């Protein structure tokens, strides 16, 4: 595969990272937006565009495995400006440095890397606040995107941003091996997903899954153990039928209010 136009590669389960990708594209002019899930079967991705960005959420102080795997496939021209943006709920650690290192394995790293705080929403771990309680967070996102866009527009080189919390970076370093084990086994955790009887077989979960991990069997979703734990299936279920064990039954669901269901399902723009 060859990328010749200015492009943002994004991965998004709640819509937060997709909102950032849309906002960056709007500020800088029309970028192609490509869902990283659509690149899984590409053996190599040759990047000849003037600018390319990678935007993704932070999971356990790491980039999602799918982002790491696609980053390994990128063969980037020396003339291409490369930026990364990590959306996070408060503990991003050194995730952009990890992306930079991964890209450098193929010769070229990030020219700049930015962190954007977005509403925390891991419904598998805690009860997320509903979107209307995050207005200030969305306002700060707009401000940060303006600053980032100016840097990208001028093609400035800038060190990757890291967590402002020393303890966050310290814990990440101390428990790095344990975190890596958690990440490498995330795909197995989808055995805890199930659907209640109010599932209406609408297939939204099947369509929205970025790694095609869900299919309907006997009119109920089943998970095929390729899960990235992006939580799109549980967050966007219109009937609140999809659950993770029993702990999510009474929890809120979070969907970014600035991103539509169709935008989440689409693979490219």
What are these regions (language model features)?
Residues 194-222, 228, 232-249:
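Iron-sulfur cluster-binding cysteine motifs and their immediate structural context
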Residues 1-7, 12-20, 26-38, 42-56, ...:
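FMN-binding flavodoxin-like domain, especially the glycine-rich phosphate-binding loop
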Residues 4, 29-30, 189-191, 219:
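Generic structural motif recognizing short loop/turn segments at the entrances and edges of beta-strands
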Residues 17-20, 95, 191, 201, ...:
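Residue-level preference for nonpolar/small residues embedded in alpha-helices
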Residues 8, 136, 199-200, 224:
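Short N-terminal micro-motifs specific to bacterial/archaeal maturation
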Residues 130, 223-224:
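Short helix/strand-bridging catalytic loops that position acidic/His residues to coordinate divalent metals
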Residues 167-202, 207:
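A mid-sequence, solvent-exposed acidic-amphipathic segment
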């Amino acid at each position: 595969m060859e990328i010749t136009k200015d492009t943002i590669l994004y991965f998004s389960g709640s819509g937060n990272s997709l909102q950032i990708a849309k906002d960056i594209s709007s500020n800088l002019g029309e970028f192609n937006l490509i869902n990283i899930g659509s690149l899984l079967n590409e053996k190599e991705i040759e990047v000849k565009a003037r600018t390319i960005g990678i935007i993704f959420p932070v999971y356990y102080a790491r980039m999602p495995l799918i982002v790491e795997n696609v980053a390994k496939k990128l063969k980037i021209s020396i003339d291409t400006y490369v930026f990364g943006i990590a959306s996070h709920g408060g503990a991003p650690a050194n995730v952009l440095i990890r992306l930079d290192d991964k890209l450098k394995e193929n010769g070229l790293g990030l020219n700049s890397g930015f962190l954007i705080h977005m509403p925390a929403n891991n419904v598998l771990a805690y009860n997320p606040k509903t979107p209307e309680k995050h207005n200030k967070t969305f306002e700060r996102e707009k401000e940060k995107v303006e600053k980032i866009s100016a840097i990208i527009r001028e093609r400035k080189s800038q060190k990757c941003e890291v967590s402002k919390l020393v303890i966050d970076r310290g814990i990440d370093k101390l428990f790095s091996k344990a975190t890596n084990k958690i990440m490498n086994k995330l795909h197995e955790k989808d055995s805890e997903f199930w659907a209640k009887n109010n599932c209406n077989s609408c297939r939204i979960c099947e369509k929205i899954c970025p790694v095609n991990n869900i299919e309907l069997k006997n009119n109920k979703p089943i998970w095929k153990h390729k899960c990235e734990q992006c939580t799109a299936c549980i967050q966007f279920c219109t009937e609140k039928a999809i659950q993770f064990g029993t702990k999510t039954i009474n929890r809120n669901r979070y969907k970014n209010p600035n991103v539509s269901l169709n935008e989440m399902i689409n693979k490219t723009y």
